[in-house]
Structures are given as structure tokens and as C-alpha cells.
Amino acid sequence: MLEKLAKQTAVYGISTIAVRFLSYLLTPYYTRIFGQETYGIVTDIYALIPLALTLLTMGMESSYFRFSAKAEEAGGDVKAAKRRLFATTWGVTSLAAAVFFVVVAFFRDGISHLMGEAYVAHPEYIVWVGLIILFDVWSCIPFSRLREQGRALLFVGLKALGVVLNVVLAVAFGLAGLFSTGFGVGWVFVANLIASAVTWLVILATVDRTVPKINWALLAAVFAYSLPLLIGGLAGTANEFIDRQLIKYLVPEGAMAELGVYGAITKIAVVMMLFYQMYRLAAEPFFLSNFKKSDFVQMNAAALKYYVMASMLIF
């Protein structure tokens, strides 16, 4: 079983490192194009997106793995049970994301004033970011389904598609001189939006014509399991990204410029975060599918030991 975990970690890991490294090449690219204050807008927005994604996915990713395993344990028509689970979790997250976007788009002017002077002249930034979040949430459960099915290569291929498209568009916009126009940094969000939308359209081909449809009885059970995960996820995400907001609101002068510098420097820690990410992508469905096996405790202990050893080596 540990061999399977190691294999999936390697698949997720090599591809994740390559894709994320390509994505992080945008950091020196953007810092050469934009001034410190302008790049501060990028840092600010991309610190808020993970919080919105955590809130709107509601812990349903992990719940999907858990209840998929329960469907297999229960026997019967496992395929129908998993299809019902997928339709329910996908449906509720899609609905939540749609409502979120409508609210954000409707109140974009008020939100732009709340976020600071840098956004007042460009409330459209809020709309573009809302659309990015919408498409990313709509893609979330289909991606979880691929992980649950062990289709690691397809998973990383689709993730790579989005990142590569984002990078290519960003470079193309820069070469075309669009970042120097009045819309400026907004083209960063447009590139991301196009990449997220294309990824969502492509991943739709993997859902086997399943229509998002909420089974309310099943949702109650799933949400009871996911609620603690949601709370923990929000706490973890806030802990990881709240420092950006503290800089934005507590630095007396030049806060956005300082935020831009800080955001660029924190990219240095990317290697450790990449290793954590690649292990989590493989470990989460693996453990939630095997936790009832007799040797699970020993297997978990061994996996954690090697994870800590590898983490110390990277450090």
C-alpha cells in the first residue's frame, strides 16, 4: 500500500513541482513589469482568493473521498451511489459559487471601496476575480473525483493546462504592451480568468454527463462531516495568508508597496510548500480510502515518518 502512495506522490510531485515552478516564474516577470505598489494589488488579491475557495468548497473535497469509500463499503450499486455523491457535492459547491459571484458583481463598487484606494478606479477587478473563483470552485469537485479514481496523470495534465495557459497569456499580454495601458494589472486577472474558464470547460468532459443535482438527505450527512473540515480549513488558510492583510492595514505609509515587496519575497519558501502540496494530493484520498484496514495505524506511522524525514531534508 505504501508503494501505491509513493507512486502517486511521485506522479503528483514531479508534475506539481514542474507546473508550480513555471507558475512562479511569473513573479520575477511581474516584478520587472510592475512597480511595488501595483504588484501589491496582485499580492493582495491572490491572498484573498484561497480564503474564498476554502469557504465555498466547504470541505467537500475531503468529504467526497470519505463518502466514496463508504459507498464501496456499503456494497450495492456503488457506481450509482458515487454518481449521486458527485452530483450532490458538485451541485452545492457550484450553487454557492454562483451566489457568491452574483453578490460580488452586484456590490463591486462597495467592495472596491472597502478594499482600498487602489481598487476604487477599477471595480472591474473585483468582477474578474469573482469569475476566477467561480470557475475554480466549479472545477473543484471534478478534480477531486479524478483523484478519488486514481487518475493522477489526467489530474496533473488538466492542472498543467491551466497554469501553462495562464503563463503564456501573461507573457503575451506583456509583449503586446497591454500591462502599460489604463487597465494595467487587470490583465493579470484576465489571463487567470481565461485559464480557469478553459480548464473548467475541458474538465467537464470527464463528468460523464452528470448534472449537478443536490440530494438533500445525503448533503446533510456530508455537510455534518465537512463542517469541522471547513472550520479547520478557514483557520489554516487565514493563518497562511492573513499576514498580507495585516501589512495592508497596519503599515502607516506605502502599505501597498510594502505588500508588493513582501509578496514577492515570500515566494522563496515555495519549495517546501510544493512538497507539502504534492504529498497532500496523494495522501488525502489514499488515507481516507484505507483508514479502516487493519494495518492502517502502522501504514500511517510509516508514511508520516518518511514525510517528516523528507521535509527536514528540504529544510
Task: Give the label of every model feature segment.
Residues 51, 102, 117-139, 190, ...:
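Alpha-helical transmembrane segments of multi-pass membrane proteins
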Residues 70-89, 261-315:
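Specific pore-lining/lateral-gate transmembrane helices of multi-pass inner-membrane transport
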